């Protein structure tokens, strides 16, 4: 079985969870990883095959989402290009940890995610 594990890199929570999940998946299946979001120095034991820029959320000083900045400062043409280039069709299973590029690619390609 071939599995794609897609991880959001905002913060360290998703990546910390991945550190525990990756070895378990590798015991039972062939695993490839993609990431999206801001560059992060958190080291995964398994290197991602691809990193996408994805979508960035911008926040106000009090921690809520700044919707104006989020809407206007993301490059949606690049995002669409990333979605269309994400190879979701070559996997038997996609595990998605809040990673938007593979999720949208799976939706557009009628692949369960």
Q: Residue spans of the language-model regions?
A:
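Conserved nucleotide-sugar donor-binding subdomain of glycosyltransferases
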Residues: 64-101
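A short, Lys/Arg-enriched amphipathic alpha-helix followed by its capping loop at the start of a domain
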Residues: 21-29, 42
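Nucleotide donor/acceptor-binding cores
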Residues: 1-2
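An aromatic- and histidine-rich active-site surface loop
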Residues: 41, 94-109
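A short, glycine/small-residue-rich beta-strand->loop->alpha-helix junction that serves as a flexible
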Residues: 6-19
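A generic structural motif
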Residues: 26-33, 89
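Conserved nucleotide-sugar phosphate-binding/catalytic loop shared by glycosyltransferases and other
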Residues: 5-9, 31-79
